[in-house]
Swiss-Prot record:
Residues 625-639 are annotated as: Required for interaction with nucleosomes and DNA. It comes from Dictyostelium discoideum (Social amoeba). Keywords: Chromatin regulator, DNA damage, DNA repair, Methyltransferase, Nucleus, Repeat, S-adenosyl-L-methionine, Transcription, Transcription regulation, Transferase. Residues 1-67, 83-306, 450-470, 486-571, 585-681, 741-767, 862-881, 963-1102, 1463-1559, 1610-1661, 1735-1762, 1772-1791, 1799-1845 are annotated as: Disordered. Disruption phenotype: Individuals exhibit 4-5 hours delay in development. Development does progress with fewer fruiting bodies and smaller spore heads. No apparent changes in cell cycle regulation. It comes from the Eukaryota. The lineage of its organism: Eukaryota, Amoebozoa, Evosea, Eumycetozoa, Dictyostelia. It holds the Pfam family DOT1. One of its GO terms (molecular function) is histone H3K79 methyltransferase activity. In contrast to other lysine histone methyltransferases, it does not contain a SET domain, suggesting the existence of another mechanism for methylation of lysine residues of histones. It catalyses: L-lysyl(79)-[histone H3] + 3 S-adenosyl-L-methionine = N(6),N(6),N(6)-trimethyl-L-lysyl(79)-[histone H3] + 3 S-adenosyl-L-homocysteine + 3 H(+). This is Histone-lysine N-methyltransferase, H3 lysine-79 specific. Its main location: nucleus. Residues 52-67, 90-162, 191-226, 239-263, 453-464, 750-763, 862-877, 972-1011, 1020-1067, 1084-1102, 1467-1522, 1541-1556, 1610-1642, 1799-1817, 1835-1845 have a biased composition (Low complexity).
Length: 1845
């Protein structure tokens, strides 16, 4: 049978059955190897390596040698195991006519793309197999015949039988142990074309490949990943049984002639990697014989299996049926173990096999446990021509036909049968090489030579054909058919998979085509859209052109209208200008007429004035002549007096030495008692380390009492300012103090020696001054202890900022007081205990001595003569009572809040409503001081006495706090002394001279005791000393006011004396209910020696103590602050141990205090629980928030002022824009000029670039509140488009500056600025409206303008970050001036503590700040309902100690500028009254320049007359009945010459001030807490008034009293002083004023009504101007705002406002804190005005009763008074002095009344009832009935003038 095979690449199938396919191998010999023991072949697989491929592959050339045309024959041997055979399936059949080209060379495609055999081809193969003989399946002769038939196509072929039935190969069941094949596509083996040029058919040999793994490892297997795929050149083959023998014979003959050696090459296509499938190269497979292991080489790219070359062999036919002899055959045994194939396994030597039936019938599964034995040389038999070839060199086997191999090298795969179908070109028959059964253990392969092939084949075929049966052949055919069917199914499956892949590829192509189509369509759509856009662009351009054309037309129309409007406005302006000129002409004429009238009036007045002056000059000439005569007489008298005084001085010096010694003993005892009981002064025990010198200081304390050196708090302030109050080391403090103590002791000894040695007074003064200067420097060095200084300053602030004085003596005693009265012991605690024990012992001894001294003094008073006593009093008072220096702080020291103790103290006050201004619970504050770093000092303080004597006039006067009060002790002592004095007076009623002597003695004792007290009470706190002085002043005034009564008692009337004592006792009993525990020991009070104290010789031993008036730059000032207010309680003064004192009952009444009134009203004791009278929480609110309702009255008044200013501006040619005009301009032109309004909203949310506008309504609100004025420089930080700047510039005319960070908004503002300038020029606005500058910069960066210029800033800081706000506040602190305002939409002060002034950035602002509620629609971004804007004021940066004296004076004198509800202008002691003079009542007031001459200095004061606005002061209609004489009162603490100066001043004043006339003034008081006008704010007081008093509200607004020129000059310009219209005002330069004239209460009320009528009759224009003037003054002053807090409806909220303002004293400068204190006092008193009104009636009735009694006494004693004056002339030659003293007593009598007036004025009793009470007091105290008083007063003063002459 001839076969034509075409090479095609087919896929490998995973079949489990063994199939044989025909191949035509040619064995190519490359090298010859000697025969050896181990002759296996190794398989090397090379992958992707062409170099290795070239090295390993051998050229396919024909070569001469042994083994050409070999045929594989296998012989089973039962003794050896069968090696695994390859599953080789026939995939193609031979064609009818083979050609050399087809057999020699044919290209092979890729293994993946090579299809399997088709179904038709397989059907053609099936009928050939059953035609074989039963003995053998196919013989070699048949194969040769088939090959010859193929080579001869001309021969007609017979009908071919179908392929033999291969079903027997599939019938057997597979072994259960066999595993399925791998799913991975096995490699495909493609045959390479042999290089054979011969036309002869090649050998057809059957190969049995028994191969192991390709890896070098003996245990690894990779055979299941590879397949041998053999393909024939033709797709079909045919078997012809009839011609088998012939064909075989022919083929054998042909083969015998062909002795060429052929190479057999097996090409294996491996599909392990994907790269192999992509490439179309076939893979050669060579089996090598090295190490008997087939190595699979992966280095070759073409994936060829290279079979190592076969050894040279001799051809010999071996009969399969009979075993060959051992010397004639070569057996190659394949040995394998389980799951492995040993290294010796290889493709064994191929032999020609003669198939037998036994082999065909025998089929078994391939066992993997077969073993192979290597070839040996002993098995070769060369003699019998049966040469067994031994592989000696590598050899390639080329397979021209397609061979399909199943994976056989894996131990996982076994089959029942393994047949090798080989179809070669020279043979026509198919040889089947079945595998042996499991029992066969060895297979013998022999190689036969080619010349024996034909003979052996014929013999074998004949023998086999005979033995075979037809049944067996049919069975085999059936088996073959079944196998082919199964194979066909597999091929169909493979074809289906290939078709599926092709379908997938088609789908992919289709998808790609669709994608391209879709892209094409999209491109088309894009082109269409582009065309549409082009059309739209053209349309838009066309519309834009149309729009511009339309806008141009509109612009032209608008310009035309604008021209018309301008023309109409021009005409209107011209019309208004004509009208304005007409009005101006009329106004000018009216003014000229008025000026002409005024000029005539002035000329007339000038003529009258000249005439009057001429008359006055003549009178003055006469007076001067009289004075010169009197002076000459006085000089003669003075010379006589001086001679007598020199004689008396020597006697008195000896007495003074004894007195000093006794006084020192008394003082030491008193000091010890003071320390034990802590009476009304602060003790600060400083622990110095002076133990070594303490004994010396105690021993010398008695003799050196005068060496006391003082330092002022002004000097202390300089020390404190140099020190930073940081903690100092204890050792340094101790060393400093030790050295200071030593220096003081040494210097004190030297000073004492000098004082003893120097006898002259002048030398003493010089030495003392030097020593004082030295000791002051040392004291300053001693105060280097910073903690001590800090403690002193802290105590000073706790006490309300009272000025005090420090002194240091040689005993290391430091005195802290206002007048240096009581020293402080600087001793340790054990030393203090010793002193206390000594004091107790000395106290008992002292009491005994005092009793003895009292008896002695009583005897001396009876025996001494009047002449000597009077002289002694004048001398002793001049010498012993020397004035002491008082160093006052012009401005209290201000220390930064840097220490923990101070912080804790202030925090305690703030948190618990315990403000030091109200002196509540001071004990707790002192405990805090003890705890806070003051371990070295013990601070003790008598808080109860301080609360009794404090000046706050609030709740602190409680009955429970009045224990252990020194003033109470004074009263008890005075009561006892009154009893003693009464006894003395009663015993001496008959002797007038003796009475006068008693008076003089009492004056001596008083002066002496006062001097001693002045030395001892040096450490009293300021407040205590001042209060004691005030009480003494009151007592002296009381005593002086009782001159008439006391004179009557002394001379004639014991009954009157008893009545006065009874009155005193009744009033004292009332005071005793409040004051207890007084009667233990006498207390010393401070006195200020003055002319009043020396003049008490004629007033029955009554000491007159006046409060010192503080000095500033040598000029006296009014006590304006609360520390200077007089307590005003009438307490009698101790004048010694046995002096007589009497007091007037009416003067000892209790002060109208809120707490006292409340006690009397409720008739219950005061409780410590909270009530409405006590202070509420200070932190009820954080700021002063003003509602729209509270702003309304102020805005109404401001509108009137603005309208008036607008009219004035128009009158002066200044035109500003109105609000309506601005709205038209802004919304009509400026706003519409913004092309793209959406630009305003292009910002980042919640950033500093957020844009929000302030609407014009908000700016109008600012203007109405007066926050922005034409003189201001306004700066808007974040101005946006500049709408705020334009409006303020247009309406106010101020200079404006804008800062904007956004460039787009800045550009819009510049365009709007151009529009604004054009429009303003058209309207004719003032040039000040053009001062607009806008900068595009960042505030945090570099500024383009001067930041210090603006004084009003605005920040719309709703979205400003904290960093930006802090940086802006730092700029304020660095550049802005004090008083600069900052308006914000969000508060810059989140919280406030006093320490924030120095530590926080918002400390630059004053506190509390203000917030104002906004109108609705004030902001663009919200409705602004219930929203507020904030107003901050930058505080003074230099808020520390101010040493500029002129600045302080200016502040003190300008404090009353603040219009307030209660004008607290002067204290009670600063306005004493003077007795009337004898001049006529009709004469106008005069000004007489008065020179007060003294022995040492001469001071002159110029007259002052001030004309002030009428709302505050206006002259009353009623003129006083008689002129009264002023009396001077010199402050002893500020003078250096004592009583001598005072005496001279009294004489001059008595002579010069006789014709002065007082001026009646009226103060208009405002009750408004809101600081508004009287008409608007008086409604708040109606609630507290009785219904009967509401109609008299106008009466309560005015108070009539008189002022002198000095006080009027100290009052602020808001007060007006005016005189009668017919005469000019002239006042005396005396510092005291005259009291009002004597009149009844009814007449006084009538006068008040008349004044109110005059006020109401004034024109409306003047009232309006007055109201506006008040508001304007309010703005200039600053301080508290002019409006009230929000919801200030209840009384407690009003108090909260006042308390909160007082709290600012911790944060504000001292000047402003004083203003707040004044405001607080007034508001508290206003709040309690209702209680005062209810209690007034009872007080008024009591005063009436007292006044009636005094009137009766005055009528009875008129004659007796005249007798006393006559007796005084005969008793002493100094009658003038005595008479002056009597007049002074009467002045004091009036002085108390005036004090009551002033205290009532300060306390706020400014209603009509108060006026009535005061006027009644004045009438009751000074005068009798309306008719009798005039005569009596005139007679009295006429008598006095006669005596003076």
């Amino acid at each position: 049978m001839s076969t034509n095979s075409t090479p095609r690449k087919q896929k490998l199938s995973n079949s489990k059955s063994l199939q044989n396919s025909p191949i035509s191998p040619t064995v190519k010999k490359t090298n010859s190897f000697p025969l050896g023991n181990n002759i296996p072949t190794n398989i090397n697989r090379s992958k992707k390596d062409k170099n290795n491929n070239s090295n390993n592959n051998i050229n396919n050339n024909n070569s001469n040698g042994i083994g050409s045309n070999t045929i594989i024959n296998s012989t089973p041997i039962a003794t050896t195991p069968v090696p695994p055979l390859p599953f080789i399936h026939s995939s193609s059949s031979s064609s009818s006519s083979p050609s050399p080209s087809s057999s020699s060379s044919s290209p092979f495609p890729k293994a993946k793309k090579s299809p399997s055999l088709s179904i038709n081809q397989q059907q053609q193969q099936q009928p050939q197999q059953p035609q074989q003989s039963p003995q053998s399946q196919q013989s070699p002769q048949s194969q040769q015949s088939q090959q010859s038939q193929q080579q001869q196509p001309q021969q007609p072929q017979e009908q071919q039988e179908p392929l033999p039935n291969l079903s027997f190969l599939r019938n057997q069941e597979p072994d259960k142990n066999v595993l399925p094949t791998s799913r991975k596509r096995p490699p495909s083996v493609m045959p390479s074309t042999p290089n054979q040029s011969s036309n002869s058919s090649s050998l057809n040999s059957s190969l049995n490949f028994s191969s192991s793994n390709s890896s070098p490892s003996p245990t690894s297997t990779q055979s299941n990943n590879s397949r041998f795929e053999t393909r024939s050149q033709n797709d079909q083959y045919e078997n012809n049984n009839n011609n088998n023998n012939n064909n075989n014979n022919n083929n054998n003959n042909n083969n015998n002639n062909n002795n060429n050696n052929n190479n057999i090459e097996c090409i294996v296509i491996d599909d392990d990697d994907d790269d192999d499938d992509d490439e179309g190269n076939s893979i050669k497979s060579t089996h090598t014989s090295t190490q008997s292991t087939p190595i699979r080489d992966r280095r070759q790219r073409d994936n060829k299996w290279t079979i190592n070359p076969l050894p040279q062999f001799q051809r010999e036919i071996i009969d399969v049926d009979t075993p060959s002899p051992p010397n004639e055959s070569l057996s190659i045994v394949s040995q394998t173990t389980t799951n492995t194939i040993t290294d010796t396994t290889s493709i064994q030597t191929p032999t020609l096999i003669r198939q037998s039936s036994s082999l065909l019938s025998s089929s078994s599964s391939l066992s993997p446990s077969t073993t192979s034995t290597p070839l040996t040389q002993n098995n070769i038999n060369l003699q019998n021509a049966q040469v067994i070839a031994t592989m000696t060199a590598p050899m390639e086997i080329e397979l021209p036909t397609i061979v399909q191999l199943e994976p056989l090298f894996s131990s996982e795969f076994t089959t029942s049968t393994q047949n090798l179908f080989i179809q070669t070109p020279p043979f026509t028959s198919t040889l089947t090489l079945p595998t042996t059964t499991a029992q066969t253990s060895q297979t013998l392969f022999t190689i036969q030579t080619s010349h024996d092939i034909n003979n052996n084949n014929n013999n074998n075929n004949n023998n086999k054909n005979k033995n075979k049966n037809k049944k067996e052949i049919e069975k085999e055919k059936e088996k073959l058919r079944e196998a082919l069917k199964q194979k066909l199914k597999e091929y169909e499956n493979e074809n289906e998979k290939e078709r599926e892949k092709e379908r997938k590829r088609e789908r992919e192509i289709e998808i790609e085509r669709e994608r391209k189509e879709r892209e094409r369509k999209e491109r088309e759509k894009e082109r269409k859209k582009e065309k549409e856009r082009e059309r739209e662009r053209e349309e838009r351009e066309r519309k834009e052109i149309e729009r511009k054309e339309r806008e141009r037309e509109e612009r032209e129309e608008r310009e035309r209208k604008e021209i018309e409007r301008k023309e109409t406005e021009r005409k209107e302006i011209e019309r208004k200008e004509i009208e304005r000129k007409e009005i101006e002409r009329k106004e000018r004429e009216r003014k000229e007429r008025k000026e002409r009238e005024e000029r005539e009036e002035r000329e007339r007045e000038e003529r009258e004035r000249k005439e009057r002056e001429e008359r006055e000059k003549e009178i003055e000439m006469e007076r001067e002549k009289k004075k010169e005569k009197e002076k000459e007489k006085e000089k003669e008298k003075e010379k006589e007096k001086e001679k007598e005084k020199e004689k008396e001085k020597e006697k008195e010096k000896e007495k003074e030495k004894e007195k000093k010694r006794k006084e020192n003993e008394v003082e030491n005892e008193i000091e010890k008692e003071r320390r034990e009981k802590n009476d009304s002064y602060m003790v600060l025990n400083y622990h110095h380390s002076i133990d070594d010198h303490h004994s010396e200081s105690e021993s010398e304390s008695d003799s050196d009492q005068d060496s006391i050196y003082s330092i002022s708090t002004q000097e202390l302030s300089s020390v404190i300012s140099d020190n930073d109050f940081c903690d100092s080391d204890n050792e340094k403090v101790a060393n400093n103090n030790r050295t200071v103590g030593e220096t003081f002791l040494n210097d004190s000894r030297n000073n004492n020696n000098n004082n003893n040695n120097n006898k002259n007074n002048n030398n003493k003064k010089i030495e003392n001054d030097k020593n004082q200067l030295i000791e002051r420097e040392r004291l300053i060095s001693a105060f280097n202890d910073k903690a001590f200084l800090y403690a002193l300053d802290t105590i000073r602030e706790v006490l309300g900022g009272i000025d005090f004085k420090l002194k240091v003596s040689k005993e290391q005693i430091i005195e802290i007081s206002t007048n240096a009265k009581k020293p402080l012991n600087i001793l340790s605690e054990p030393e203090q205990q010793q002193q206390q024990q000594q004091q107790q012992q000395q106290q008992q001894h002292q009491q005994q001595q005092q009793q003895q001294q009292q008896q002695q003094q009583q005897q001396q008073q009876q025996t001494t003569k009047t002449t000597t006593t009077t002289n002694n009093t004048t001398t002793t008072t001049a010498e012993t009572e020397k004035p002491k220096e008082v160093f006052l702080l012009k401005k209290p020291i201000k220390i930064p809040y840097g220490r923990d103790c101070k912080k804790r103290l202030i925090r305690r006050f703030h948190g618990t409503s315990r403000n030091p201004l109200f002196h509540k619970n001071l004990e707790s504050t002192l405990k805090l001081l003890k705890r806070a770093k003051f371990d070295w000092a013990s601070i003790e303080f008598d808080t109860k006495s301080y609360l009794m004597n404090c000046n706050c006039k609030t709740v602190c006067h409680k009955s429970e706090r009045m224990k252990d009060n020194p003033t109470n002790k004074l009263q008890n002592n005075n009561r006892n002394n009154n009893n003693n004095n009464n006894n003395i007076i009663n015993n001496n009623n008959n002797n007038n001279n003796k009475n006068n002597n008693n008076k003089n003695n009492n004056n001596k004792n008083n002066n002496r005791n006062n001097n001693s007290i002045a030395k001892k009470i040096g450490t009293n706190n300021n407040n205590n000393n001042t209060t004691i002085i005030k009480n003494n002043n009151n007592n002296n005034n009381n005593n002086n006011n009782n001159n008439n009564n006391n004179n009557n008692i002394i001379k004639n009337n014991n009954n009157n004396n008893k009545n006065n004592n009874n009155n005193n006792n009744t009033i004292v009993k009332k005071i005793e209910t409040i004051k207890k525990d007084i009667n233990k020991k006498p207390t010393k009070t401070t006195t200020t020696t003055s002319s009043s104290s020396s003049s008490t010789s004629s007033s029955n031993s009554l000491t007159v103590i006046k409060k010192p008036v503080k000095k500033i730059n040598g000029s006296q000032r009014i006590c304006l602050f609360e520390d200077d207010f007089d307590v005003g309680i009438g307490v009698p003064v101790t004048t010694g141990t046995s002096e007589t004192t009497t007091t007037r009952a009416s003067s000892i009444r209790r002060k109208m205090n809120i707490s006292n009134i409340f006690d009397d009203f409720t008739k219950k004791p005061r409780q410590n629980k909270y009530n409405e009278i006590e202070m509420p929480d200070l932190f009820a609110s954080k700021e002063c928030n003003y509602t729209l309702e509270q702003q309304a009255p102020f805005i109404r008044a401001q509108k009137l002022l603005l309208t008036q200013q607008h009219e004035n501006n128009l009158y002066n040619g200044k035109r500003f824009m109105k609000y309506d005009e601005w709205l038209d301009l802004y919304h009509g032109e400026m706003r519409s000029s913004i092309q793209n309004p959406k630009v305003l909203k292009h910002y980042i949310s919640f950033s500093q670039e957020v844009y929000g506008e302030a609407e014009p309504t908000l700016l109008r609100h600012w203007i109405h509140l007066g926050l922005i004025k034409p003189t201001d420089v306004f700066c808007d930080i974040g101005c946006g488009i500049g709408n705020v700047l334009f409006q303020l510039a247009a309406q106010v005319g101020c200079r404006v500056i804008g800062v904007e960070i956004r460039k787009d908004l800045y550009d819009i503002s510049q365009s709007m600025l151009e529009i604004y300038k054009k429009r303003s020029l058209e309207l004719g606005l003032h040039p000040s409206t053009q001062q607009i500058k806008i900068y595009n910069c960042d505030v945090k960066g570099s500024l383009e303008f001067d930041f210090s210029e603006p004084n009003v800033f605005f920040m719309h800081n709703t979205c400003f970050g904290p960093e930006l706000e802090i940086s802006i506040m730092e700029l304020f602190k660095k550049y802005s001036k004090p008083g600069t305002k900052v308006i914000t939409m969000k508060t810059l002060c989140p919280r406030f503590k006093p320490s924030d002034k120095k530590t926080k950035p918002w400390g630059i602002f004053k506190y509390p700040y203000e917030s104002y509620e906004m109108e609705e629609g004030s902001l663009s971004w919200r409705s602004a309902t219930n929203c507020s804007f904030y107003s901050f004021t930058i505080d003074d940066k230099d808020s520390d100690i101010v040493t500029d004296q002129t600045h302080l004076n200016r502040v003190i004198l300008s404090t009353p500028k603040k219009k307030h509800s209660k004008l607290q202008l002067f204290s009670s002691s600063s306005l004493p009254s003077s007795p009337p003079s004898s001049s006529s009542s009709s004469s106008p007031p005069n000004i007489a320049t008065n020179t007060t001459t003294t022995t040492t200095t001469t001071t002159t004061t110029s007259p002052s007359s001030i004309s002030l606005p009428s709302p505050y002061l206006s002259p009353s209609k009623k003129t006083p009945n008689s002129n009264k004489r002023d009396r001077s009162d010199i402050d002893n603490s500020n003078s250096d010459d004592g009583d001598e100066n005072n005496n001279n001043i009294n004489i001059n004043n008595n002579n010069n001030n006789s014709n002065n006339k007082p001026i009646k003034l009226k103060l208009s008081m405002d009750h408004s807490i809101d600081n508004q006008s009287n008409s608007e704010s008086s409604d708040t007081d109606v609630e507290y008034m009785p219904w009967s008093k509401r109609n008299n509200r106008k009466k309560r607004k005015s108070l009539s009293y008189s002022l002198d020129s000095y006080l009027s000059s100290r009052i602020s310009p808001s007060l007006s002083l005016s005189t009668s219209s017919s005469s000019s005002s002239s006042l005396d330069s005396s510092p005291y004023s005259s009291p009002p004239s004597s009149s009844s209460s009814d007449n006084e009320n009538d006068d008040d009504n008349g004044d109110d009528e005059d006020d109401s009759s004034s024109s409306n224009d003047t009232k309006l101007k007055e109201k506006l003037l008040l508001m304007k003054n309010n703005e200039k002053i600053g301080g508290a705002p002019p409006l009230t807090r929000r919801n200030a409806n209840s009384d407690t909220n009003k108090l909260v406002q006042g308390c909160y303002q007082s709290l600012s004293s911790y944060a504000l400068p001292k000047e402003e804190s004083q203003i707040h204190k004044l405001q607080l006092q007034a508001k508290l008193l206003e709040h309690k005005n209702s209680l005062v009104l209810k209690h007034q009636k009872s007080i008024h009735d009591q005063q009436k009763r007292l006044s009636r009694k005094q009137k009766k006494l005055a009528k009875k004693n008129k004659k007796k008074e005249q007798q006393l004056q006559a007796q005084a002339k005969t008793i002493n030659y100094n009658n003038n002095n005595n008479n002056n003293n009597q007049n002074d007593n009467q002045v004091n009598h009036n002085n108390l009344n005036e004090n009551e007036i002033n205290t009532d004025l300060i306390n706020g009793y400014n209603n009509n009832n108060n006026n009535n009470i005061i006027n009644n007091d004045n009438d009751n105290d000074n005068d009798n009935d309306k008719d009798d008083d005039k005569d009596s007063n005139n007679k009295d003063y006429n008598n006095i003038n006669d005596n003076n002459k």
